[in-house]
């Protein structure tokens, strides 16, 4: 309990020192103007405190959970907006997004979201959306791992729909080329700077062998390994990821500091030690993104500032606000189902 208490004290101090980072960039769809940090000031004043507490306890149990929660937020926002659709299980007319290719056997942390929602419902029934809870959990996950904090605009509502097909076409894949990744970010109203900064979240977490095997043995269907991959790093990866079998074997996205949110990810790209093809192409395939990688590798503070701004911007993708959507009582199912 003492360690959990120290996490919460650290988080509280961090938020007290955090400047409000505002983002006026345009996102496609939704009414993001109805999102503002004090949305729950009267209706649920302890909402952020409750989310912080549950996330801190989950992080205490398993530090990997921070990366998992951040990934859930990203995968939610890129598919019909930040509306909690990813959290829905299959039920009635709902076909879950959890079984789509980008999420199947890799998206995790749903139990923690359930814990957060239960605590919020106990404090303020029918008030705080699952979409907002997940957005706050992503911010808290950054702070717990040593990353930046930011003021989260709130007021999202939850969707009553989900799409198993949309994640397959809207989310970037680990083996995508640069142009495909950039297009998918652009489709969500995010620019090149957002792409590079948000990719920096891969400074924490892990990826499955099945997501990077092609770089070791069959890059772009050539039957040969990716010759740009740093040789000693490639040898380490081959020990963890055989040519066949071991699909679920894990490797750190940032081999130098997998549990600490820092700018090591960008330094790795410069050394040709990006785990995923979708990581390494940020340095190898586009001059503008290469310069951003270099800048963030040299200046962690600048990376942190841009990451916070880009997370705010991503969190404003096509939100449901006002009377649209609903406030789910349980994040896994729509109300009255």
Curated annotation (Swiss-Prot):
Site annotation Transition state stabilizer: residues: 71
CDD domains: secretory_peroxidase
Amino-acid positions noted as binding substrate in the UniProt annotation, renumbered to this chain: 172
Protein name per UniProt: Peroxidase 14
Details of cofactor binding: Binds 1 heme b (iron(II)-protoporphyrin IX) group per subunit.
Active site (record annotation): 75
GO biological process: hydrogen peroxide catabolic process; response to oxidative stress
Range of residues in the leader sequence: 1-22
Leading EC class: oxidoreductase
Role noted for this protein: Removal of H(2)O(2), oxidation of toxic reductants, biosynthesis and degradation of lignin, suberization, auxin catabolism, response to environmental stresses such as wounding, pathogen attack and oxidative stress. These functions might be dependent on each isozyme/isoform in each plant tissue.
Subcellular locations according to the entry: Secreted
Catalytically driven reaction(s): 2 a phenolic donor + H2O2 = 2 a phenolic radical donor + 2 H2O
UniProt-listed InterPro entries: Haem_peroxidase, Haem_peroxidase_sf, Peroxidase_pln, Peroxidases_AS, Peroxidases_heam-ligand_BS, Secretory_peroxidase
UniProt keyword terms in alphabetical order: Calcium, Disulfide bond, Glycoprotein, Heme, Hydrogen peroxide, Iron, Metal-binding, Oxidoreductase, Peroxidase, Secreted, Signal
Extra facts: There are 73 peroxidase genes in A.thaliana.
Positions that bind Ca(2+) 2: 203, 254, 257, 262
E.C. code: 1.11.1.7
GO molecular function: heme binding; lactoperoxidase activity; metal ion binding
Cofactor(s) listed in the protein's UniProt record: heme b; Ca(2+)
A GO cellular component entry from the record: extracellular region
Keyword Membrane: no
Residues bearing glycans: 24, 191, 218, 249
PANTHER family in the record: PEROXIDASE 14-RELATED (PTHR31388:SF104), PEROXIDASE 72-RELATED (PTHR31388)
Main location, first listed in the record: secreted
């Amino acid at each position: 309990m003492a360690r959990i208490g120290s996490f919460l004290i650290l988080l509280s101090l961090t938020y007290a020192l955090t400047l409000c980072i505002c983002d006026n960039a345009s996102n496609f769809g939704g009414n993001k103007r109805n999102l503002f940090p004090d949305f729950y000031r009267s209706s649920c004043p302890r909402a952020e405190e409750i989310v912080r507490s549950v996330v801190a306890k989950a992080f205490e149990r398993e530090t990997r959970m921070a990366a998992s929660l951040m990934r859930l937020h990203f995968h939610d926002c890129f598919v019909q907006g930040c509306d909690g659709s990813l959290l829905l299980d299959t039920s009635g007319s709902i076909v879950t997004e959890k079984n789509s290719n980008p999420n199947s056997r890799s998206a995790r942390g749903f139990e923690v979201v359930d814990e957060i929602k239960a605590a919020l419902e106990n404090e303020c029934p029918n008030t705080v959306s699952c979409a907002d809870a997940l957005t706050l959990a992503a911010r808290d996950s950054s702070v717990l791992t040593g990353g930046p904090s930011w003021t989260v605009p709130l007021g999202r509502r939850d969707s009553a729909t989900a799409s198993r097909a949309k994640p397959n076409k809207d989310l970037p894949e680990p083996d995508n080329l640069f142009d495909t990744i950039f297009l998918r970010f652009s489709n969500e109203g995010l620019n090149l700077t957002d792409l590079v900064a948000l990719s920096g979240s891969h400074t924490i977490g892990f990826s499955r062998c099945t997501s990077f095997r092609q770089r070791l043995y069959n890059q772009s269907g050539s039957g040969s390994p990716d010759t740009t991959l740093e040789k000693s790093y490639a040898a380490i990866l081959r020990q963890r990821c055989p040519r066949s079998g071991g699909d679920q074997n894990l490797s750190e996205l940032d081999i130098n500091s997998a549990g600490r949110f820092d700018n090591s990810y960008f330094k790795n790209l410069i050394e040709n030690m990006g785990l995923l093809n979708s990581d390494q192409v940020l340095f190898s395939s586009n001059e503008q993104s290469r310069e951003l990688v270099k800048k963030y590798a040299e200046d962690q503070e600048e990376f942190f500032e841009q990451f916070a701004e880009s997370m705010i911007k991503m969190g404003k993708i096509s939100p449901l606000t006002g009377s649209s959507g609903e406030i789910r009582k349980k994040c896994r199912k729509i109300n009255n189902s």
